[in-house]
A protein has these predicted regions:
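Small-residue-biased structural context
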Residues: 1-217
Length: 217
């Protein structure tokens, strides 16, 4: 293998998920504010679904073909299993968000056994946080070891294809929303110049008007 894979996009995306989880946790303590952050929650789900679905279809299979050791194969099985754990946790947040006071359970208002919004978000944050850490600590080094920059480019190209222009118009300013200065610099430096210009002139102002977290952040 020749060349080093640049994981900038992976890290900045993971960190954007973490920031959104922090925003959701902060809002969970105020049931009256749930409607205000619903747009941010829907975007979080959209971004996470895209990220995980392309990993499942185009990254893990490619990695499976490249590895030979049993420990590496177990790691890939763990990655897929961790993805599968996330969907029911997202559904639990949806259910709890419909009744943030906690009186509605997963089967309806007569079922008081469902988690409160704060509890559902805490479970999601724990599971997703552990998965992101696991991926960064073990899967990314394995990818660096056995895949090529061309392999990674193919994965990134599929991500962009599924995202489309409309998706990119939200993804780019979402990544920048609340990112530290150094992370913003690295992310913008990895983008083509026309994309950074589009973001500055069109996408960023439009993103702020969407008010994902109640107001421009």
């Amino acid at each position: 293998m020749t060349g080093t894979i640049d994981f900038t996009m992976m890290y900045v995306t993971h960190n954007a998920f973490r920031r959104d989880l922090d925003r959701l946790a902060a809002a969970a303590g105020d049931p009256a504010g749930t409607g205000r952050i619903r747009a941010g929650w829907e975007n979080f789900k959209t971004q996470l679904h895209l990220h995980h679905s392309v990993e499942d279809s185009h990254l893990w299979p490619r990695l499976q073909r490249a590895v030979t050791g049993p420990d590496d194969l177990v790691l890939l099985e763990q990655m897929e299993a961790e993805h599968a754990l996330i969907d029911p946790l997202l559904a639990a947040v949806d259910t709890a968000m419909a009744d943030p006071g906690g009186t509605r359970g997963p089967t309806g208002p007569s079922d008081p056994g469902g988690p409160t919004l704060a509890e559902a978000l805490r479970e999601l944050s724990t599971a997703l946080g552990l998965h992101l850490e696991h991926e960064e600590a073990d899967a990314l080094p394995l990818i660096q070891k056995v895949l090529t920059p061309a392999d990674w480019k193919a994965f990134a190209s599929e991500m962009r294809r599924r995202q489309g222009f409309k998706g990119a118009a939200v993804y780019v300013p979402w990544i920048l929303d609340g990112a530290p200065n150094e992370e913003r610099r690295r992310f913008l430096g990895a983008l083509p110049a026309p994309v950074t210009l589009l973001n500055r002139l069109l996408w960023q102002p439009r993103y702020l008007r969407l008010g994902f977290w109640g107001a421009g952040s």
